[in-house]
Amino acid sequence: MKVFYDSDFKLDALKEKTIAVIGYGSQGRAQSLNMKDSGLNVVVGLRKNGASWENAKADGHNVMTIEEAAEKADIIHILIPDELQAEVYESQIKPYLKEGKTLSFSHGFNIHYGFIVPPKGVNVVLVAPKSPGKMVRRTYEEGFGVPGLICIEIDATNNAFDIVSAMAKGIGLSRAGVIQTTFKEETETDLFGEQAVLCGGVTELIKAGFETLVEAGYAPEMAYFETCHELKLIVDLIYQKGFKNMWNDVSNTAEYGGLTRRSRIVTADSKAAMKEILKEIQDGRFTKEFVLEKQVNHAHLKAMRRIEGDLQIEEVGAKLRKMCGLEKEE
């Protein structure tokens, strides 16, 4: 798999173009500011006088309605939540798409699953930082960047690569390294990682460990430290050095205990469940479920949020984070 760097990309394809960033959340703010600071012509499209309107203006952006931005721009970069994109696209963006324009995303969900079907003659690309928005912005300001992905679904103008690579350079991704992939691969692997490991798997593992210790009579504070708080230390070691060097940095007791017991926690059944989760992503079952959830105003999701908020580990964690001086990071 080829990795591109700053010297591989040029901004030339965007020099005379206008980029409309639709949305001003964490990624919208970071990506738009980075491209603006890279000398690109950026406008921000938002709901008139919405919560983000004044924030974007305060950051020095040329702010306009989504319709105005879509009409004005050559590249329309959609960074609003996945479940809102199709509706906004149909009513506020599609009427202003003309041949030669480029539709861009940072997640392939709506293109891959067919919720957005662009007209002929329009490029469809993706540029995705592999980091939260705050880090995208901070590392750019520090003179570096975060890794990212680019992909091309439709190259209607025969220069879609030049356009998306220039966007990646403008955001600062090529300072760290950019990998070219496909909408299918980006979407399916991203969803799987979130569900099985990063958001779903890890939180369930932490909860189970915490509850096991508390049910055995140990202090909830001790349980939190040992199953949640210290996780960051291990993840940071893996992030910086990989598995092998993480094992080198922990004690022999931790290494032996971890290596000999881990397969009893994540079993063959766990991997079978992961394969089923991946299959649900690949065949569209998860997508249908998520669409139905939106149709009932996220009733199930809201109920799950309430349950998570009432967990004992949340109450204990809030106290300990305050004690550790971490409350400012929340």
Swiss-Prot record:
Residues 1-181 form the KARI N-terminal Rossmann domain. The gene is ilvC. Substrate binds at residue 251. This is Ketol-acid reductoisomerase (NADP(+)). It is an enzyme of class 1 (oxidoreductase). The lineage of its organism: Archaea, Methanobacteriati, Methanobacteriota, Methanomada group, Methanococci. GO terms for molecular function: ketol-acid reductoisomerase activity; magnesium ion binding; NADP binding. Pathway: Amino-acid biosynthesis; L-isoleucine biosynthesis; L-isoleucine from 2-oxobutanoate: step 2/4; Amino-acid biosynthesis; L-valine biosynthesis; L-valine from pyruvate: step 2/4. Mg(2+) 1 binds at residues 190, 194. Residues 182-327 form the KARI C-terminal knotted domain. Keywords: Amino-acid biosynthesis, Branched-chain amino acid biosynthesis, Magnesium, Metal-binding, NADP, Oxidoreductase. Binds 2 magnesium ions per subunit.
